[in-house]
A protein has these predicted regions:
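Extended alpha-helical targeting/anchoring segments
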Residues: 1-374
């Protein structure tokens, strides 16, 4: 296991020739701290797995350190379904650390910041949380995927802290010399009961000036971040304003790609590009100051990144959103949500978007906010 600073990680990346799995918390770069974040996760944590299972097109490949792949496969077949005995009569009380009225007031203030030129776009988050509640992380993860299956999901454990993540967003992927980033900005609620209205929502999202302005700012930031370490002239936008379908929502996703020099170190890439453009804003330094000023809690692993590094130094990392952070020791959980704020933002609609993004998690927890229809 590894935990330490980014400079320490630089040596780990250079010296390791095996798989590594782990995370970078948002705080690891913004606060420059070595201590654990408020949610209990280390700022930076990576581990070398005992076994790696790769499933592609119905073909399972098993790589192991101390056991034969055959033994691991037979152990999987013999494994019984493990679940914790949780009291199903529990009542969960979910609260927000910023209530609706205060949220609207903060968005109005952020629009003033934008109007006077402090920034152009800022990602602002609120946190829903509950205390004294026990959950089974594995069952919760399976339930979350059933409601909201997404391509960058993960169930991740660091001591007694769990990340139950159904992320739709990729931060960075490196394959050989090519690196890509795929910022998401732009969300529309789907209507699966009415195909005509569902198609209309998709069309409105694709044509929305407000959503396009959010997206293009994230794209410009990603281009700037990648240009700091990619070969000169290699950074380009291969897709702009793509509309992708998910079970709950439509998302506007763009793809920025570039060519990295030989022997590029992941620590240098993280130093240049993290935190990601879609979870900060423009200009990045100023909006990170505003985030610290207006958000009520440090983000921790939320809006950080979880991923893996292959023995060939390729890697793939997500953006930690649409996630439950659960502390099994204190029996507390939280799930922050947010969105990009621009001058065109309407505070009431921004709040509705936050609730929409939280709805899948609230659904599996069996909770409805008393003053909102989800």
């Amino acid at each position: 296991n590894f935990t330490g600073t980014l400079s320490d990680f630089h040596h780990l990346y250079e010296e390791n020739n095996d798989w590594l799995f782990g995370h970078f918390s948002y705080v690891s770069q913004t606060e420059k701290e070595k201590e654990k974040t408020h949610d209990g996760f280390d700022n930076i944590f990576f581990f070398q797995p005992q076994a790696v299972l790769i499933l592609k097109k119905n073909i399972l490949t098993i790589e192991t350190i101390n056991h034969s792949p055959e033994d691991v496969f037979h152990a999987i077949l013999q494994q019984e379904n493990i679940s914790l005995k949780i009291n199903n009569d529990q009542k969960i009380n979910i609260r927000a650390n910023i209530e609706k009225e205060e949220y609207i007031s903060i968005i109005q203030q952020l629009r003033k910041n934008i109007h006077r030129g402090d920034c152009y776009e800022i990602n602002f988050c609120i946190q829903f949380f509950a205390e004294n509640y026990s959950l089974d992380p594995l069952e919760t993860f399976k339930n979350l995927l059933a409601v909201s299956p997404n391509p960058f999901s993960c169930l991740y454990k660091n001591e007694h802290n769990f990340l139950i993540c159904a992320s739709p967003e990729r931060f960075l992927q490196k394959e050989g010399k090519q690196i890509i980033s795929q910022p998401i900005k732009g969300t529309a609620r789907r209507d699966l009961q009415n195909k005509r209205n569902d198609a209309l929502q998709k069309k409105l999202l694709s044509e929305s000036r407000k959503e396009q302005s959010e997206n293009v700012m994230a794209v410009d930031l990603a281009r700037n971040d990648l240009s700091r370490f990619c070969e000169e002239g290699s950074v380009q936008v291969s897709e702009l304003f793509g509309i992708y379908s998910f079970p709950q929502v439509y998302q506007m996703i763009s793809t920025v790609e570039g060519i990295v020099p030989v022997n590029i170190n992941l620590a240098d890439i993280i130093d240049a590009a993290f935190p990601m453009a879609s979870m900060t804003g423009a200009p990045k330094k100023k909006v990170m100051e505003l985030i610290r000023q207006y958000e009520k809690t440090n983000r921790g692993i939320f809006s950080g990144t979880v991923g893996y590094i292959t023995p060939k130094k390729n890697f793939d990392f997500n953006v930690v959103i649409r996630s439950i952070v659960y502390n099994a020791k204190t029996k507390s959980l939280s799930f922050p949500v947010g969105g990009g704020i621009t001058w065109l933002s309407e505070p009431e609609k921004e709040y509705e978007e936050c609730v929409l993004k939280a709805s899948a998690i609230m659904k599996i927890l069996g909770y409805r906010l008393p003053y909102l229809i989800l």
